[in-house]
Amino acid sequence: MPATGIFADSITKIKNTIKALGLVAVTDPRNARPLTCLIEMPTYTQFTNQVADISVVVHILATPPGNQESGDYLMTTLDTLMDSELAITGGSPTLVVIGAQELPAYDVTIRIGAQR
């Protein structure tokens, strides 16, 4: 059964925005691969039972090894996301382990205010 509610709606908004930018967005780690954006589960701060401040980390994944070519891809993709309607509050370069492989990545935090 697919998820419903404000958390699922927030993930869907992020995923659709990333796709509209011509990027590949995935929510299932089994489908994560280089040149995709892996959307993590949300964290949140609740104000009332009707309002929440939702944060979602998106991993921009590049091809190994972590050389200049992958760095260029990460910075270009990050710039594309920053130029969108997404409310990006921060980010940092990292390595993401998918299966047994380390992928160069950039972790981007996106915030969404959600209301029922």
Where are these regions (language model features)?
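Charged, amphipathic alpha-helical segments and their flanking helix caps
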Residues: M1-T27, E40-R116
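Short, well-ordered secondary-structure micro-motifs within conserved domains or adaptor modules
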Residues: N31-M41
